[in-house]
Amino acid sequence: MLRGQTLPWRAALQQVSRPFIPRPLLAPSRYNVTARSILNASRLHRSLPTSRAFSSSSIRRREKPPPGDEKDDPAQKEQKDANEEKDVERAPDARRKAADPSGKQGSSHEPGAPTSGFARRKEKAGADKEQRGLEEDSKKDGNAVEGKGNSSDTPSPIPVNGGSDSRPSGANNGGNEDGGKKGKKGSGEKALQKPSVPEVYPQVMAIPIAKRPLFPGFYKAITIRDPNVAAAIQDMMKRGQPYVGAFLFKDENADGDVIENLDDVYDVGVFAQITAAYPLRGEASGVTAVLYPHRRIKVSSLLPPSDAAKAGTTDEKTSERRGDVVASFEEGTAELAPKDHYEPTSFLRKYPVSLVNVENLAEEPYDKKSAIIRAVTSEIVNVCKEIASLNPLFRDQISAFYTDQFPGNLSDEPAKLADFAAAVSAGELNEMQEVLELMNIEERLPKALVVLKKELMNAQLQSKISKDVEAKIQKRQREYWLMEQMKGIKRELGIESDGKDKLVEKFKEKAEKLAMPDAVKKVFDEELNKLAHLEPAASEFNVTRNYLDWLTQIPWGQKSVENFGIQHAVKVLDEDHYGLKDVKDRILEFIAVGKLRGTVEGKILCLVGPPGVGKTSIGKSIARALNRQYYRFSVGGLTDVAEIKGHRRTYVGALPGRIIQALKKCQTENPLILIDEIDKIGRGHQGDPSSALLELLDPEQNSSFLDHYMDVPVDLSKVLFVCTANVTDTIPRPLLDRMELIELSGYVADEKMAIAQRYLAPAARELTGLKEVDVNLTEEAVEELIKSYCRESGVRNLKKQIEKVYRKAAYKIVRDLGEDVLAEEKALTDEGKAVQEESQKETESPDSKSPVDPEKSTTETPRVALKVPESVQLSIGKDSLTDYVGPPIFTADRLYDTFPPGVTMGLAWTSMGGAALYVESILENALTPQSRPGIDITGNLQNVMKESSQIAYSFAKSVMAKQFPENRFFEKAKLHMHCPEGAVPKDGPSAGITMATSLLSLALNHPLDPTIAMTGELTVTGKVLRIGGLREKTVAARRAGAKKIVFPADNMSDWLELPENIKEGIEGHAVGWYSEVFDLLFTDLDKGAANHVWQKQLAEKPEKKSNEVEEDE
């Protein structure tokens, strides 16, 4: 607008900016009630003097001015427009003054303020005239459009964005302005009245709420996210009609801002006033509205959002022509429509919101002096006091509620007290709604008391939990506080030196007791000097301290006194293990050499054998025999080199390797370190641990072993290393070359019997509580266990089976004795009874404030062992063994009593020891001159064994061609060779002579002796080569009923080393060539008959002549 230009006041009003005045909103507490501050702020806001601000609801639309304006003369209209323009210019400043919380008037330099005493007197006179005009108009009209008003304790509507103020409209205007009496004359404009809450509001916008209902007199902030509902609320605030109905969702998980169906909400809610509304942070359309409920209402009908929007489109033109009118703020005029057709929420029909027709609910009359009401009221007050003593927040809410709602006695307002009790409680949804719906005070008070009692229980539980937690941490905090005070006092008195100096002295004392080498001593002094100059808060301080701790933990120069007694060593080794002659002899040799030299050096031994033969346990026995400290660690599956040689000190949490840790634990330089499962060591991206063992297990290098963490040479030459492995194939060759191998073979039946009787059975009896009971496991039963249940090389499974037998026996004895032999209360010792009584007291004590100590609750109560009568006896024999361990797992190894042609018995070595391996050969098709030769091989044979079968087939054909040339069996025979137990993989070269013998037996049609077993590798020229596992194979042959065993001549030394108890009853035959095997197996063979055995089948049959007869001519 150009300077000096004047506009009509209606046009100027459109350009006036209408600032939004938000009210402060406190975060809603869990009780959903207002705090004292928000109530005081609302009262202060209502008491502030405010200037008049134009409301859009009090001005007619400019498209159709009221008839009063058309009758005014042009001069008067121009003067009035000028005055209204001034009023518009002052309105924003007046509103800013009204929002000022200080309540002071603006200074003289503010825009719109009077600049002289004359102007102020003129403004006052104008205000007086306007006030007198308003009083006269109200007397003439009699009935205003607004309602009759509510009690004085209800809050007045808050003017927002041009809403009406609570003061008269002409308070700060001049006498000639629009709000004065002169401007009122003949204008038809409606004067503004003091706002009040209408008692009758038949139609309101319904807002659904979740979780908790609203109660009259208690504020609650709600969040509106629906943009249409938010826009409708903003429009209501602008028009000065901030009234809504709040109704609770029946489903506590429901959400939304629009009611689609009346069945979704309860029909009883509250008529609430929006006291403040402001946009949500981070959202463009949502608002947060603060509601103040005034009274209870009930829904009579719902106008759904779709119908409301449709109705809004048809009534839009009518609303535009008629204008927007605030029923509770303005007086009616002659131009308005009849009162009975007027609806104050008609402007909301253009929004898709929920409109409901409601009716007020009035409380039923009650007698304040009723005994029931007084008693329940008194109980509610008492419960509130109890909750206030437990919850400080609740105490503040009670104080604010009492100050605002009860100027007099509490018993005078039982209805409000019941609403307060329900509003502050955290009850169930249906319980809270039931309190809201009850109009009978005598019924409402007990319901509210029940809800409040639940809140008291919650408060008591919270208080108890808080006290329990506080009791747990109070003692620790007190000790920490006292210790800190003590440290400070000692530091001030000089009694205690600095912790760093004390640490340095401790390291020096440790180092003086050790015989550190010069190189190590130098490093120690350097690190100790660095520690003395470091601050304790520095990160390097902890690293240096830990390093010095490890340096002083290694036993430099500390050795254990070794025992060189041969007899003592033999006694100790025989106590723990039966057999293992090779290992025991090697240890005795080690002791003898040390006794002759006066000192011993470290050795690296490697015990190789099947599982369960005692490799790991013999290491502990060796340490006890030599009086050395024992340390064991397994490298099976190890893939990190740092486990052997440690981590660099630069890493966080770095530690030395296992070897340095072993020295720290043993505290000697000459311990026995057992490295278990060395054949199963792994390899990963972090290095190859087997390569790291090369330095460790090399007698020439381990005198200066260098750990990555220690970074100083450590002497390991006096350490006795014992490694264990099942096989040597997976051990790297350089590492295997550094160790002295001692092979341990599996136990035979006699050795297992001795081990079971000497070690396993007594240990199992003690473990199962049968040490003092007469339970006898016969020798025949143990033999049956070994033969039919436990055929493995070791004795682990035998130990399990014997323990199983004794466990079954213990169960049988207790079951037969019955439960009355020793009563439960008599089974406890004196100590156990004391513990039981103490636990019962702690359990039954109602005043226990802390939970039971977990250590006491998990401690086993001492009990008296059951005394079995001496008359109880139990003998477990071979026949009754199945009752304890079930049916036998292994049957007899002997598959044939007599061998048919083509069947032979070989011998094999398995992880469970030796086993009989049968080879079967058959003729697939009948021999004819036209048949084609070939061989099929089955039995899950692996590569090496398949090659042996091919060699045996070729060698058998060679033997037949040389010794039986007329026997053309292999030229025409289609053969099938099979090894039984096809589910078991089979491999190895030692079945060569067995396969060749099977083929020759079939070709010669000659059965073999079933008491002869054989093993040996065969070459194509007939040479028999060396095999392994002769001990186990011999045991298997004896178990299968063999009387003779054929083995290679190169294994003669192994045969001679076998104990006599193994070779007893078996005749050994060493062979170097297969011809010796042939002569031994086919002694009674008729070579002439064998040469022609298949001649009939292979003979050419003569062709039949034709029946045609030649005729003579």
Curated annotation (Swiss-Prot):
UniProt keyword list: ATP-binding, DNA-binding, Hydrolase, Mitochondrion, Nucleotide-binding, Protease, Serine protease, Transit peptide
InterPro entries in the record: AAA+_ATPase (IPR003593), ATPase_AAA_core (IPR003959), Lon_bac/euk-typ (IPR004815), Lon_lid (IPR054594), Lon_proteolytic (IPR008269), Lon_Prtase (IPR027065), Lon_prtase_N (IPR003111), Lon_prtase_N_sf (IPR046336)
Gene Ontology molecular functions: ATP binding; ATP hydrolysis activity; ATP-dependent peptidase activity; sequence-specific DNA binding; serine-type endopeptidase activity; single-stranded DNA binding
Compartments, as annotated in UniProt: Mitochondrion matrix
Region named Disordered: 42-196, 828-864
N-terminal signal peptide: none
Any Gene Ontology CC annotation: mitochondrial matrix
Lon proteolytic domain sequence ranges: 898-1084
Keyword Transmembrane helix: no
Pfam families, alphabetized: AAA (PF00004), Lon_C (PF05362), Lon_lid (PF22667), LON_substr_bdg (PF02190)
Lon N-terminal domain sequence ranges: 204-456
Record-annotated active site: S990, K1033
Enzyme nomenclature, EC number: 3.4.21.53
Transit peptide: 1-61
Domain of life, per lineage: Eukaryota
Example GO BP: oxidation-dependent protein catabolic process
Enzyme class, first EC level, given as a word: hydrolase
Catalytic activity: Hydrolysis of proteins in presence of ATP
Compositional bias segments (type: Basic and acidic residues): 64-99, 124-143, 178-192, 828-858
Family as reported in the entry's similarity comment: Belongs to the peptidase S16 family.
UniProt xrefs under NCBIfam families: lon
Function, in words: ATP-dependent serine protease that mediates the selective degradation of misfolded, unassembled or oxidatively damaged polypeptides as well as certain short-lived regulatory proteins in the mitochondrial matrix. May also have a chaperone function in the assembly of inner membrane protein complexes. Participates in the regulation of mitochondrial gene expression and in the maintenance of the integrity of the mitochondrial genome. Binds to mitochondrial DNA in a site-specific manner.
Quaternary structure annotation from Swiss-Prot or TrEMBL: Homohexamer or homoheptamer. Organized in a ring with a central cavity.
Protein name: Lon protease homolog, mitochondrial
Organism (species): Aspergillus niger (strain ATCC MYA-4892 / CBS 513.88 / FGSC A1513)
Name of the gene encoding the protein in the UniProt record: pim1
